[in-house]
């Protein structure tokens, strides 16, 4: 959604409590557009909370540290942890970057420093032992883990 369209839609719906940047594709792939939109919403609707749902690979996508920059406009971040190891992550996510899992964990640690709220998320379809391992990964970093229910 472009800033102009978003602005007109938001004027109609002032009752929104939260706007989430997410969807099919990674929002930080269009970092400048996302930040411009977030800045606009922040200026026009300061009471609306802004959240980013991300794969956590923004630093790699944009070739620079991004958590602090994003946190200037976004209140909270939810990072798709997906699974409990680099090998399983590569199998499930098929990232284009080497060491993507480690990069995602680094982004999460940076995000925790800058955002009001940082969380990891997984879907409840992975094995119970992997869920427990994901919980440990989150706990070791002091980051909340959200376990989402799978829905068709």
Residue map of PLM features:
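Conserved AdoMet/S-adenosylmethionine-binding subsite of the radical SAM
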Residues: 24-152
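Active-site groove signature of glycoside hydrolases
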Residues: 15-26
């Amino acid at each position: 959604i472009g800033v102009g369209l978003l602005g007109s839609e938001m004027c109609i719906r002032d009752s929104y409590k939260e706007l989430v940047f997410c969807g099919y594709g990674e929002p930080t792939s269009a970092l400048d557009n996302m930040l411009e939109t977030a800045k606009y919403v922040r200026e026009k609707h300061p009471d609306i909370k802004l959240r980013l749902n991300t794969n956590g690979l923004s630093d790699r996508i944009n070739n620079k540290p991004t958590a602090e920059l994003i946190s200037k406009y976004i209140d909270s971040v939810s990072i798709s942890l997906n699974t409990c190891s680099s090998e399983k992550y590569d199998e499930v996510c098929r990232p284009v970057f080497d060491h993507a899992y480690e990069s995602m964990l680094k982004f999460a640690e940076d995000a925790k420093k800058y955002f009001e709220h940082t969380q990891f998320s997984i879907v409840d379809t992975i094995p119970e032992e992997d869920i427990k391992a994901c919980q440990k990964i989150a706990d070791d970093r002091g980051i909340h883990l959200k376990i989402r229910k799978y829905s068709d």
